[in-house]
Amino acid sequence: PPEAHNMRKLLLTFVLALALCVPSLAAETWNVGTWKTAQTIQPFLYAPFADGAAVKVHPFTNPGDQKAALLAGSLDMTGTTLALAIQAASRGEPIVLVASLGNKCSALVVRKDGGVKSVADLKGKKIGYVPGTMHEILLRETLTRAGLNPDRDARLVRIDFFDMGTALSRGDIDAYLSGEPLPTLAKRQGYGEILAYPYYGEGIGAINSGMIVRRDFVEEKPERVMEMIRAHRKATEQCMSDKAFWLETASKMFGVELDVLRDAADNMELVW
């Protein structure tokens, strides 16, 4: 209905203004890290739920850099992949997982007309990935299920998420496994095809990313951590209850065509 559309536009304008403007007289500032993607958008939407706190969002492209910034004290909370969070905790690093961020969003993409028709055809091929991410774990699981040894039967090439499309279109790699909207973009722009969605009921599953804080931050400021988690929950629920608002906001914030996000939406899930 026109009324609902107008209300959504008004709310979208309000959220965008809050995300871009940091009040100078706020009692406290939350420094939060995340990626500039639709499936990790929640921190950009905390402001209406922050009870007067200023929210400064720091976008990253690599989960390792996010964790390093958190441990250095530059961030109060940050998104990261669950693989990296588990790895960090196993090493005794002082991080605490306080919320989920997103579940599924991954896809295995191959070069169009590159001759790869099945995962088994990736033997000897160059595959782009980001180490220490859930995408790496899902890639390794997918190759193993097809009878390939990830370390011997394929050449895994470290490439930043946002460089994968260019590398595939140029022929520098034969495939990559990454999150949306890159797989959908590759398909729509004609240089790639989605070979598989790497989710298997009896395997790793659709887990992907979460929010972490430093242990000392939890111990010293437990109430602030709870406030941040509440804002995270409300931002997540807002997006999941209003899919149009979520995708329209992501499109405007991150410069991704709305139709691309609509095509990718079934492969993205926000959680808290």
Model regions: which residues?
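Secondary-structure end/capping motifs
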Residues: 219-272
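Short, glycine-/small- and polar/acidic-enriched structural segments
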Residues: 28-151, 155-161, 167-170, 174-180, ...
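Periplasmic-binding protein-like
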Residues: 101-110, 192-218, 225, 229, ...
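Short helix- or helix-capping micro-motifs
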Residues: 186
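A conserved hydrophobic position in a structured secondary element of the catalytic/binding core
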Residues: 80, 178, 213, 220, ...
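Bacterial N-terminal signal peptides
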Residues: 13-23
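Short, Lys/Arg-enriched N-terminal segments with co-localized hydrophobic residues
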Residues: 1-6
